[in-house]
Amino acid sequence: MSIVGRNAILNLRISLCPLFMGKRSFVSSPVSNSAKAVKFLKAQRRKQKNEAKQATLKASTDKVDPVLGRADTPFITRIMAELKEPLVLSKGYNIEEVDKFLAAIESAKRERAELSGLNTEVVGIEDIEKLEDRREAILRILSMRNSENKNAIKMAVELARKEFERFPGDTGSSEVQAACMTVRIQNMANHIKEHRKDFANTRNLRILVQQRQAILRYLKRDNPEKYYWTIQKLGLNDAAITDEFNMDRRYMQDYEFFGDKILIRDSKKVANQKRKEIRKQKRATF
């Protein structure tokens, strides 16, 4: 083969090489692109699932009622249970004082019987049953369960003060004031739930919640360790204290203040956002 023929064949091979290379890249590109697409879709699904889990976890841990706090808070439950005890008496009385009072009456009766010349043994047997009946009657009258709401709240505030006091007789520390306000807030909220048209007390409740926020914010600046201990014990979290909120119908509906009653209609934007959150939570369960 001549030199001219060899050069022609070499030039033909060089000219055909890009065509083969282009054809090879054209055939392999759909496979590589499909693999990338699958990886991208899997990554997106993992991301959506993680976001849904995070949203569900945040909603379950951080959603604390800024007015009433967490449900079944031990501090509140314990005080309310204390007020229902039959042996917890109103007006500051206790069982020992009632027994002393009845013993003094019995002693005075015996002295009068001796002075009048009556048989004290017969009188004593008759008075034992009467004395027990009187004791039960006095305990029923003084029982906090049968007392006025004003006396019950006074007793609850005193119990809260003793539990949060820094020293005996402490009434001015921030945690004591916040605890006493929390007891009043719980009582006022229960009253409003039973009397929905009591707008005056609804306004007073709003003011009381704002005052508690202000006191706890001051405590956070002054003593952060004591602040977090206090809000944990009161069933609150940091967002319930630091975040601004309006105790309006939106709050009452979101936190079911009046149960499942619908107080305000959601706009289309809000309704779509809620549906989107529900779908995310459902994806997280799968």
From Swiss-Prot:
Signal peptide (UniProt feature, chain positions): none
SUPFAM superfamilies: S15/NS1 RNA-binding domain (SSF47060)
Record key words, sorted: Mitochondrion, Ribonucleoprotein, Ribosomal protein, RNA-binding, rRNA-binding, Transit peptide
Protein's UniProt name: Small ribosomal subunit protein uS15m
Single GO MF annotation: structural constituent of ribosome
Quaternary structure and interacting proteins, as annotated: Component of the mitochondrial small ribosomal subunit (mt-SSU). Mature yeast 74S mitochondrial ribosomes consist of a small (37S) and a large (54S) subunit. The 37S small subunit contains a 15S ribosomal RNA (15S mt-rRNA) and 34 different proteins. The 54S large subunit contains a 21S rRNA (21S mt-rRNA) and 46 different proteins.
Top-level lineage group: Eukaryota
GO cellular component: mitochondrial inner membrane; mitochondrial small ribosomal subunit; mitochondrion
Compartments in which it is found: Mitochondrion
Gene responsible for this protein: MRPS28
Miscellaneous comment in the UniProt entry for this protein: Present with 6960 molecules/cell in log phase SD medium.
Organism per entry: Saccharomyces cerevisiae (strain ATCC 204508 / S288c) (Baker's yeast)
NCBIfam families assigned: S15_bact
Post-translational modification comment from the UniProt entry: The precursor is processed in two steps involving mitochondrial intermediate peptidase (MIP) and mitochondrial processing peptidase (MPP).
Annotated function: Component of the mitochondrial ribosome (mitoribosome), a dedicated translation machinery responsible for the synthesis of mitochondrial genome-encoded proteins, including at least some of the essential transmembrane subunits of the mitochondrial respiratory chain. The mitoribosomes are attached to the mitochondrial inner membrane and translation products are cotranslationally integrated into the membrane.
Similarity field: Belongs to the universal ribosomal protein uS15 family.
InterPro entries named in the record: Ribosomal_uS15, Ribosomal_uS15_bac-type, uS15_NS1_RNA-bd_sf
Alphabetical list of Pfam families matching this protein: Ribosomal_S15 (PF00312)
Transit peptide: 1-33
An individual GO BP term: mitochondrial translation
